[in-house]
UniProtKB/Swiss-Prot annotation:
It is found in: Plastid, Chloroplast. The lineage of its organism: Eukaryota, Viridiplantae, Streptophyta, Embryophyta, Tracheophyta. This is Large ribosomal subunit protein uL22c. The keyword Ion transport does not apply. Belongs to the universal ribosomal protein uL22 family. This protein binds specifically to 23S rRNA. The globular domain of the protein is located near the polypeptide exit tunnel on the outside of the subunit, while an extended beta-hairpin is found that lines the wall of the exit tunnel in the center of the 70S ribosome. GO terms for molecular function: rRNA binding; structural constituent of ribosome. The keyword Lyase does not apply. CDD domains: Ribosomal_L22 (cd00336). GO terms for cellular component: chloroplast; large ribosomal subunit. Part of the 50S ribosomal subunit. GO terms for biological process: translation. It comes from Capsella bursa-pastoris. Keywords: Chloroplast, Plastid, Ribonucleoprotein, Ribosomal protein, RNA-binding, rRNA-binding.
Amino acid sequence: MIKKRKKKSYTEVYALGQYISMSAHKARRVIDQIRGRSYEEALMILELMPYRGCYPIFKLVYSAAANASHNKGFKETNLVISKAEVNQGNTVKKLKPRARGRSYPIKRSTCHITIVLEDISFYQQNEEYLMYLKKPGCSNENRNLTCYDTYSSGGLWDKK
């Protein structure tokens, strides 16, 4: 079995909720509305949406932001939901007794929700630095930010 190694990102924080008693389809309907939005905007959307699945997702987003501020020292105003995914969990199966000795199955579906928050202040600082380097007052030694094309180095790969 091949395992993918995740790079440890210094700008990402996540929260994982497992075995939440909700259908994965219903959770995805809510998650699609907040993916890519800022932390504060996502909280406002989740508070105003009339779905039952909003509350556990609200708690997860809030928990991820608490992880960001406590563990990494990020400010909540700079957080953006970079990744939000819903996976299907186990299905709890029960039998409900009915008339004449019969029984009907009840399926209770669960889901696993992952929320990843990213700090965008790191990228804003890099943009400011690049804008500083592009100013005409900077020397040419610091402005060399070219990336050499590794595939056109000659040899076998240039031929068709």
